[in-house]
């Protein structure tokens, strides 16, 4: 059987959120991130909300809310997201309360996401980080369904900060089988090679969150 052809470098770049969420990041680091993102031709840059506003002509600016633990009060997440959008963020990646999901408290997860959705209305894309590596398959499916009901635009695997790990092909495939075609699927956390990125895209990821974008893109054909 013939191997599936790899997507081109440009095709992959168009799906990348070039990300800098390190707590020690400086304004100069963000400026360097933006410059590299423009050189690479990626879709977006993703930075911490405290680094906004970011001047990034030609790029989408994304940020996070309730990051990385998800243990913030829903109203705090909503306020953080709303302020970020006021400061120019076009996309917000919020973290759910993973403990609530692990406990099967899906009504609490729903309320959390709805609060953020209502806070930003339709002014920005809302991605919901579920920390898939910390959840059972059943919980992944249920949280994806909850995110869809709450009005999210994407579900996202991971913050990249959770000790359970980051994106996996299994989780992405499960997420895509549950809400793919209706919601975007963002894989993030521990994606450092072109091979890993290609596997996640083949499994159904429609967006990639990467901090090592240049190294990953170097593995794709022009």
UniProtKB/Swiss-Prot annotation:
It catalyses: 2-deoxy-D-ribose 5-phosphate = D-glyceraldehyde 3-phosphate + acetaldehyde. SMART domains: DeoC (SM01133). This is Deoxyribose-phosphate aldolase. HAMAP family: DeoC_type1. One of its GO terms (molecular function) is deoxyribose-phosphate aldolase activity. InterPro entries: Aldolase_TIM, DeoC, DeoC/FbaB/LacD_aldolase, DeoC_typeI. It comes from Nocardia farcinica (strain IFM 10152). The gene is deoC. It is found in: Cytoplasm.
